[in-house]
């Protein structure tokens, strides 16, 4: 059995962060990065979700082997819980362990998806999140394009004291990544929110790159397939990678859907499809 391990779990603030109820599944002892990784590791072993929170939140996994670029087929897949009307896209990044030290400290390459290169897609987008001054408060943020806003505190659903990760000691932190144009809309008659999908290339997205077997009703078992050949440099040119050793998934939208809260990518598993 080939093994995968989580190397980093740094979500943005969100409704599932620090949550100790059954849904969030935290213990309240996740007060260090190491404890957060241990918790996320157990979650994936239990086939439960890890939320990446709002825009820029990420998880990094490594493997005990390199995943080769197999050509035309999908090389690996990531499980989310998307279904029609409920997509929360995560951007995928890959890395080779060039220096051979077993750590994800080399260069990240984005895997292009359907939105890569579009005018409304922003690379190197930054959002700085600020620790709330008190309990049960919204989390304020400022983005690199000059906007400001907040991650809503949802008192009716997620009642933990803070949505700001307990294992981040700083009073603010900045997350960087590629930001897609949001596709969430509210029906003015029913009040229901619709998080529409993107064509292909994203985790937790009801796209045309899904692996068969997931539920279209509640998103359970929903997986998206990814090709190493889609790795690109920052300028959009092909990276031509022959293999990868690390995968990062980063929440790719800065948006919220009313009572549903922030749009936040969820991951359940990572699987090498070349074996």
Language model features: what each stretch is:
Residues 98-107, 209:
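Acidic, glycine-anchored loop motifs typical of Ca2+
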Residues 11-52, 171-173, 178-231:
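Acidic/charged, solvent-exposed loop-and-adjacent secondary-structure segments enriched in E/D, K/R, S/T
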Residues 1-6:
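Short, small-residue-biased leader/transition segments that mark boundaries at the very start
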Residues 241-246:
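Extracellular Ig-like/FN3 beta-sandwich strand-entry sites
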Residues 114-218:
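Low-complexity, serine/threonine/proline-enriched polar segments
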Residues 29-97:
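Short N-terminal edge-element motif at the start of the domain
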């Amino acid at each position: 059995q080939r093994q995968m391990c989580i190397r980093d779990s740094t979500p943005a603030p969100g409704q599932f962060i620090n949550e100790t109820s059954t849904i969030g599944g935290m213990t309240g002892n996740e007060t260090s990065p190491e404890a957060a990784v241990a918790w996320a590791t157990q979650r994936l072993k239990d086939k439960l979700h890890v939320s990446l929170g709002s825009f820029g939140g990420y998880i990094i996994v490594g493997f005990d082997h390199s995943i080769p670029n197999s050509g035309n087929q999908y090389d690996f897949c990531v499980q989310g819980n998307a279904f029609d009307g409920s997509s929360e896209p995560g951007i995928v990044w890959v890395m080779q362990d060039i220096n051979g030290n077993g750590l994800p400290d080399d260069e990240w390459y984005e895997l292009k998806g359907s939105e890569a290169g579009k005018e409304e897609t922003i690379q190197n987008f930054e959002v700085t999140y600020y620790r709330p001054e008190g309990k049960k408060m919204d989390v304020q943020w400022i983005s690199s394009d000059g906007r400001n806003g907040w991650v809503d505190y949802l008192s009716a659903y997620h009642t933990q004291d803070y949505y700001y990760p307990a294992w981040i000691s700083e009073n603010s932190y900045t997350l960087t990544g590629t930001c897609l144009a949001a596709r969430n809309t509210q029906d003015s008659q029913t009040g229901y929110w619709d998080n529409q999908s993107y064509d292909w290339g994203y985790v937790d997205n009801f796209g045309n790159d899904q692996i068969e077997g997931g539920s279209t009703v509640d998103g359970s078992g929903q997986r998206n397939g990814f090709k190493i050949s889609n790795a690109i440099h920052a300028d959009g040119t092909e990276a031509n990678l022959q293999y990868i050793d690390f995968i990062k998934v980063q929440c790719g939208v800065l948006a919220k859907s009313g009572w549903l809260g922030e749009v936040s990518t969820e991951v359940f598993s990572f699987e090498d499809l070349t074996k």
